[in-house]
Amino acid sequence: RIHWDKRPNNTRRRGAYSKDGGQTWGDWHIIEALPDGHQQRSYGCMGGLTRLAVKGRDILVFSNLDTSNAKREKITVRASFDAGKTWPVKRLVFDGPSAYSSMTSGRPGTDTEGWVYLHFEGGPKGGSTVAKFNLAWLLEGTPTGDGAVPRL
């Protein structure tokens, strides 16, 4: 099953699912727990999405801004443990200016297994930054009130 995350013209992300490899999409919905960029604008900010390879689990990690200001700042990551239905935990990666982001997960059976790599515009030196973290670090974040973190 494929999850598609779309950047709409409002302050929340929209999602859809495909069961045929992306040929068709259904279950369009607004994801209330996922902000789409700074909340004082009618447009969003490109975010990242990756799946962690954890046997028996469907863990997604999403990156985007988490600010109510009209500024692009506070790049934050969130985790879902149920294929994107809920997003119960978030953690701030960088508190300053930040914007577009993309992510990838490490490959099973390599030294990168278990790591998430977040590339984002901004950071302590401006330009672009790559942050590396794992699920244990993200789980030390803030509960969002959207679902529960399962025992892992």
What are these regions (language model features)?
Residues R1-L152:
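Asp-box/BNR beta-propeller blade signature and adjacent active/binding-site loops
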